[in-house]
C-alpha cells in the first residue's frame, strides 16, 4: 500500500504567495507617501508635510531627484529648508550629479548665503570637503581660496620629492659601484686587501655628497649674508608686530565692550529705582547688556579700523609685509594671511563671538578679503 504524498495546507500556500505582494504593496505605499510629502513642500503646505511624516515616521525625507533640500535651495524656500533640517534631512546627501545641498546653496549667489548656506554649514561642516562629479567643493563654487591646511599638503609634496630623489641617487650609486668593481676585478694588487662592502661604500659617497652640499650652502650664505639676514629679520619683525597689533586691538575691543556692558547695567538699575511701575521694560536692558560681549561688524579686528573696502584692507596687509623685491618672504607672508582670513578658519575660530544677525555681513566681508588676498598671491606667481 503506497503512502499518500504530503499535501501543503491551503492557508500556508496562500500566505507564501501573499508575502511578496504585501512587501511590494508596502513599498509602493511608502513611495506614494514620499511623493505626497514632496508635493506638500513644493506647494508650501508645511503643516501637512510635517503631519504626514509624524503619522509615517519611516519615510525618507531625502528621497527624490533632486532631493528636497536641493529643491528648497533652488526655489529660495527658507521655511521648507528649516523644516527639512528639523525633520532630520542630511545636508551631505548627494544627487545624481554628486552635488550636496551646500553645492545647490552656493550656486544661488550671495543672496542665499545667510538663509541657506550658513544653516546647512552649521548642521554638517564636514560636507564642505565633499566634491561633486566635476571635482568641485562648495567653497570652490563660492570662489573661496584653497583650504587652510594647504600648507600641510605642500609639505607632503616636498617630502615625496625628497624620497624620489633619494631613490634615484641610490640607483645611480649602485650603477657606479658595479662599474668600479668590474674595472678592478683583474687587478692582482688588490687581492690581498679587504674589499669595501657596498653598504659602506654607498654610505661614504652619501656623506661626501652631503658635506659638499653643506659647504656650498655655507659659501652661498657667507657671500650674501648681511642683506638676506637683514631682510629676513625685518620681515619676521613685521609679522610679529602685526600679530601684536591684532591681539592688542582685540583686547581693546573686549575692554570697551566690557565697560559698555557695565555702564548699561548701571543705567538700567538707576532708571529702574525711581520708576517701579515701568520695571518690566527696563528689566530687558541687563539681558541686552549681556549680549554686548558679542562682536558686531565694527568690533571685528579688521586690518583697517571699522572694516571698509576689501581691496583696501588687502592692500594694507600687503603693505605691512616684506618689500616686493623679496618675493619668497612676501609669498610666505601672504600664505599666513590667507590662512588667517580664510572663511572656513575665521568661522571656526570666531563664530561664537559674533552677533547672529551680523554673521552674514561679517562673513561676506571676510570672503571678499580672502578673495582679494588670493588675487595678490596669484599676481606674485
Curated annotation (Swiss-Prot):
<feature type="compositionally biased region" description="Acidic residues">
    <location>
        <begin position="150"/>
        <end position="159"/>
    </location>
</feature>
<dbReference type="GO" id="GO:0032088">
    <property type="term" value="P:negative regulation of NF-kappaB transcription factor activity"/>
</dbReference>
<feature type="region of interest" description="Disordered">
    <location>
        <begin position="186"/>
        <end position="242"/>
    </location>
</feature>
<feature type="repeat" description="ANK 1">
    <location>
        <begin position="64"/>
        <end position="93"/>
    </location>
</feature>
<feature type="repeat" description="ANK 2">
    <location>
        <begin position="97"/>
        <end position="133"/>
    </location>
</feature>
<feature type="region of interest" description="Disordered">
    <location>
        <begin position="131"/>
        <end position="167"/>
    </location>
</feature>
<dbReference type="GO" id="GO:0031665">
    <property type="term" value="P:negative regulation of lipopolysaccharide-mediated signaling pathway"/>
</dbReference>
<comment type="function">
    <text>Involved in the regulation of innate immune response. Acts as negative regulator of Toll-like receptor and interferon-regulatory factor (IRF) signaling pathways. Contributes to the negative regulation of transcriptional activation of NF-kappa-B target genes in response to endogenous pro-inflammatory stimuli.</text>
</comment>
<comment type="subunit">
    <text>Interacts with CACTIN (via N-terminal domain); the interaction occurs in a pro-inflammatory-independent manner.</text>
</comment>
<dbReference type="GO" id="GO:0071222">
    <property type="term" value="P:cellular response to lipopolysaccharide"/>
</dbReference>
<dbReference type="GO" id="GO:0034122">
    <property type="term" value="P:negative regulation of toll-like receptor signaling pathway"/>
</dbReference>
<keyword id="KW-0677">Repeat</keyword>
<dbReference type="GO" id="GO:0005634">
    <property type="term" value="C:nucleus"/>
</dbReference>
<feature type="region of interest" description="Disordered">
    <location>
        <begin position="256"/>
        <end position="294"/>
    </location>
</feature>
<feature type="modified residue" description="Phosphoserine">
    <location>
        <position position="150"/>
    </location>
</feature>
<protein>
    <recommendedName>
        <fullName>NF-kappa-B inhibitor-like protein 1</fullName>
    </recommendedName>
</protein>
<dbReference type="GO" id="GO:0043124">
    <property type="term" value="P:negative regulation of canonical NF-kappaB signal transduction"/>
</dbReference>
<feature type="region of interest" description="Disordered">
    <location>
        <begin position="1"/>
        <end position="34"/>
    </location>
</feature>
<keyword id="KW-0539">Nucleus</keyword>
<dbReference type="InterPro" id="IPR038753">
    <property type="entry name" value="NFKBIL1"/>
</dbReference>
<keyword id="KW-0040">ANK repeat</keyword>
<dbReference type="InterPro" id="IPR036770">
    <property type="entry name" value="Ankyrin_rpt-contain_sf"/>
</dbReference>
<dbReference type="GO" id="GO:0032720">
    <property type="term" value="P:negative regulation of tumor necrosis factor production"/>
</dbReference>
<keyword id="KW-0597">Phosphoprotein</keyword>
<feature type="compositionally biased region" description="Basic and acidic residues">
    <location>
        <begin position="256"/>
        <end position="287"/>
    </location>
</feature>
